[in-house]
Design a protein with these regions (language model features):
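Alpha-helix N-cap and loop-to-helix initiation/capping positions
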Residues: 40-44, 72, 76, 107-115, ...
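Beta/alpha (TIM)-barrel catalytic core signal, keyed to glycine-rich beta->alpha loops juxtaposed to Asp/Glu
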Residues: 3-7, 12, 141-328, 343-348
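Conserved beta-strand positions
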Residues: 30, 62, 96, 134-137, ...
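Short acidic capping loops at alpha-helix termini that bridge into adjacent secondary structure
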Residues: 26-27, 61, 87-92, 130-134, ...
Length: 348
């Protein structure tokens, strides 16, 4: 059956300007980091993307290595674009990234020009696109001059293969350096994608949000639900089949007694607000208008709908924020900390 987008898709979504650019993003965007690889049925992927767009989510975030296995998220997304969304391409913001390992040898990861541009070409081929709207440096490269990495982003934009340049997981200092280089090249840094949640507050401690505001750069935060920890999934411990039980990016050590107690307390606060824990967690990262968009992941269309429901109650009282701060504690779950520093892992 031919897909026809909901006529009212723009009525309830909020769209925020990305820094000082002309780009607007939905307050909730869909990320395809997990749940879009070969281990997920195509019909499920298709249903998730359709539901997202019907709810006004116009931004779909990918990377070269998303899967599993790496690269396998972009291919089915491209197929969905061809079968369902060819008539809506001009209504979509599609992003991809390069930085993590994709192929063997010395040119298969990090931030060198050869890798970055080859990776972009591969992503475009997998998705069947002529261009992406945003192309990111996925992580800071401690061994490649930042001028080279930013030069690759600049080239991608000037060649018409990307409309905007962005960076991900860079700390404040590296962000300022990257933005300065891009500004001199004439291709501004439009967006930064850091991790941020109630349990991962490094962007506050680092001053990154202040830096972005000063630079006029937008922000789209990933893992605002702490890989599912800020949902009802782990309130009773680690369930079978969950990401933590599989020992993947969410490690079982993260789900300790202290963290579960804090999550339960946050869930109670959400209940008093008439929200699910996930909805409150999303509203919290969007508070005060400092974050342009929150990236969600979903394994079912219903999860997308629940997350978009967060936009119904975005305001917090001072008392609520103070109570949340009692339990929204840094939980050492920032897996991407090394991506922001020169002290990154050594090359193989």
């Amino acid at each position: 059956m031919t897909y026809v987008a909901a006529e009212n898709r723009y009525e309830k979504m909020i769209y925020n300007r990305c820094g000082r650019s002309g780009l607007k993003l939905p307050a909730i965007s869909l990320g395809l980091w997990h749940n879009f690889g070969d281990d997920t049925p195509h019909r499920t992927k298709q249903a998730i993307v359709r539901k997202a767009f019907d709810l006004g989510i116009t931004h779909f975030d990918l990377a070269n290595n998303y899967g599993p296995p790496p690269g396998s998220a972009e291919t089915p997304f491209g197929e969905i674009l061809r079968t369902d969304f060819s008539a809506y391409r001009d209504e979509l913001i599609i992003s991809t990234k390069a930085g993590y390992e994709m192929w063997a040898g010395p040119y298969g990861e990090w931030g060198g020009r050869k890798y970055m541009l080859a990776s972009l070409d591969q992503s475009l081929k997998r998705m069947g696109l002529d261009y992406v709207d945003i192309f990111y440096s996925h992580r800071f490269d401690p061994d490649t001059p930042l001028e080279e990495t930013m030069g690759a982003l600049d080239h991608a934009v000037r060649s018409g293969k990307a409309l905007y340049a962005g960076i991900s997981s860079y700390n404040s200092q590296r962000t300022r350096e990257a933005a300065d280089i891009l500004r001199q090249l004439g291709t501004p840094c439009v967006i930064h994608q850091p991790s941020y949640s109630m349990l991962n507050r490094w962007v506050e401690e680092d001053g990154l949000l202040d830096t972005l505001e000063g630079l006029g750069v937008g922000s789209i935060v990933f893992s605002p639900l702490a890989q599912g920890m800020l949902t009802d999934k782990y309130l009773g411990g680690i369930p079978d089949g969950s990401r933590a039980s599989q020992g993947k990016s969410l490690k079982t050590a993260f789900i300790n007694d202290r963290t579960i107690a804090n999550i339960k307390a946050l869930n109670a606060i959400a209940g008093k607000r008439g929200q699910t824990l996930a909805q409150m967690a999303l509203a919290w990262v969007l508070r005060r208008g400092r974050v342009t968009s929150a990236l969600i992941g979903a394994s079912r269309p219903e999860q997308v709908e629940d997350c978009v429901g967060a936009l119904k109650v975005l305001d917090f009282s001072d008392a609520e924020l103070a109570e949340i701060d009692t339990y929204a504690r840094e939980s050492d779950i920032n897996l991407w900390a090394a991506s922001a520093e020169r002290k990154g892992p050594p090359r193989k």
